[in-house]
Amino acid sequence: MGRKWANIKEKKASKDKTNSRIYAKFGIEIYVAAKSGDPDPHSNQKLRFVIERAKTYNVPKHIIDRAIEKAKGTGDETYSELRYEGFGPNGSMIIVDALTNNVNRTASDVRAAYSKNGGNMGVSGSVAYMFDNTAIFGVEGKDADELLELLMEADIDVRDILDEDGQAIIYAEPEDFHKVQEGLKAAGIEEFTVAEIEMIPQNDIQLSGEDLEKFEKLIDALEDLEDVQKVYHNVELED
């Protein structure tokens, strides 16, 4: 395991600071998931996953419901899922996931954010191979040993379980996200502090001085883009 959640979450802090931005991004993601299949989360696994994630960010129920109702309507707005890979200062690697109804606009915006802030766009696969796609769950009130026992009883294998920051963090294969979550719920665990699929860097680097300043400006510029849903990188940030 290249990264612990206690460190990964520091990378998320700048994006997570603005509730209105989080709500808007989840509104689009929920709409797309509901539009791609049945708008009922009980029968639409993709939609159920997005809603579970939204709950860990405290997205209000009315925003979730509004996005689902919009998907039930006659609108035919089409969104594409895109991934951009690139490089920042001094060996830093960045992955940008976007959800857009205008591919050309998004590509131009992401490219401009890189070029104006000391970064460079890479080709597909130039960065992603240095990250591990990972399902992550956070549970309070139980320790790693207790969760391991629960999962073993349910015959569910995971990569690792660690006690971090006053909670137990489960790392699993991304394709096992729903199996792990349903197994935990069957054991009586209904609330999660984290329920995500993340790209975790295999190795982190440290930046300082001007390189760190440039990097933080680049990440801010990418996260501020309307179509960007997630930004992953391999830089260790201070608390």
Swiss-Prot record:
Keywords: Cytoplasm, DNA-binding, Transcription, Transcription regulation. GO terms for biological process: regulation of DNA-templated transcription. GO terms for cellular component: cytosol. One of its GO terms (molecular function) is DNA binding. Pfam families: TACO1_YebC_N (PF20772), Transcrip_reg (PF01709). It comes from the Bacteria. It is found in: Cytoplasm. Belongs to the TACO1 family. YeeN subfamily. This is Probable transcriptional regulatory protein lin0388. It comes from Listeria innocua serovar 6a (strain ATCC BAA-680 / CLIP 11262).
